[in-house]
A protein has these predicted regions:
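Catalytic core of pol beta-like nucleotidyltransferases
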Residues: 1-26, 32-38, 47-100
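Short, well-ordered beta-strand segments
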Residues: 42-44
Length: 100
């Protein structure tokens, strides 16, 4: 995993704060691969929230807070509502992701 301890702890704290303590968090993509270079911070979350409006608000607030705390980095946040439509990116994230 190519994130510092500070980045890992900050991401986990911020996402659980906005999406609920029961949320499932994964880092996937090139930052999950120690041999890769560069790359966005790709995050997958199955939130503890159920209402679409609450999820949208949580996503916006979490991304703003992460940018303030981690600086200007490209952060991709993939949210799987569980009860929503299945997207292929969910499978990729779950198969290749590392739990935070």
């Amino acid at each position: 995993m190519r994130l510092t301890k500070y980045q890992q702890e900050t991401i986990k704290r911020v996402l659980l704060k906005h999406f609920g303590e029961g949320s499932d968090l994964l880092l996937f993509g090139s930052r999950a691969d120690d041999n890769a270079r560069g790359g966005d911070i790709d995050l997958y979350i199955e939130p503890d929230l159920h209402e679409a409006d609450d999820i949208v608000e949580a996503k916006l607030n979490a991304l703003v807070e992460l940018h303030l705390l981690l600086g200007e980095q490209k952060i991709v946040l993939v949210v799987n509502r569980k009860s929503g439509r299945f997207l292929p990116i969910y499978k990729i994230a779950k198969e290749s992701g590392i739990r935070l």
